UniProtKB/Swiss-Prot annotation:
Pfam families found in the cross-reference section: UPF0102 (PF02021)
Protein name, UniProt field: UPF0102 protein NFA_41430
Annotated family: Belongs to the UPF0102 family.
GO MF assignments: nucleic acid binding
InterPro entries registered for this protein in UniProt: Restrct_endonuc-II-like, tRNA_endonuc-like_dom_sf, UPF0102_YraN-like
UniProt source species: Nocardia farcinica (strain IFM 10152)
Entry-linked PANTHER family: UPF0102 PROTEIN YRAN (PTHR34039:SF1)
Length: 127
């Protein structure tokens, strides 16, 4: 099904975000990354995607927007959001068997402008 058709049916922010996360996960897999976890939750919040790229574990925040009226999707990852993601990453790592040689924090920006194909941008190690 074409993304434009799916976008036409996406009526609320939650569905738009879920579709953006699916596109982001597919994009990362196509780039050779392994998706380790999706929507990992604890009482303090949620991590969108956790992926592995060789010896690096990437904690990936996915931001999806319909347009640029409020800035790029990546600009929505505020200082407060970055701090929360760092804390959640430590909690996730504490639950795993490790060892974790390297970690990084990525942002995948998904811009879904009506009538156009989604534009996906993977920003590595941005915070």
């Amino acid at each position: 099904m074409a993304s434009a058709t799916i976008l036409a049916r996406v009526g609320d922010k939650q569905a738009l975000g879920a579709h953006g996360e699916e596109l982001a996960a597919r994009f990362l897999r196509d780039a050779g990354m392994e998706i380790v976890a999706r929507n990992w939750r604890c009482r303090y919040g949620e991590l969108d995607l956790i992926a592995r790229d060789a010896q690096t574990t990437a904690f990936v925040e996915v931001k999806t927007r319909r347009g640029l009226g409020f800035g790029t999707p990546a600009e929505a990852v505020t200082f407060t959001k970055r701090q929360r993601i760092r804390r959640l990453a430590l909690l996730w790592l504490a639950e795993q068997d490790g060892p974790w040689q390297q970690i990084r924090f990525d942002v995948v920006s998904v811009l879904m402008t009506p009538g156009h194909r989604p534009v996906i941008d993977h920003l590595k190690a941005v915070f």
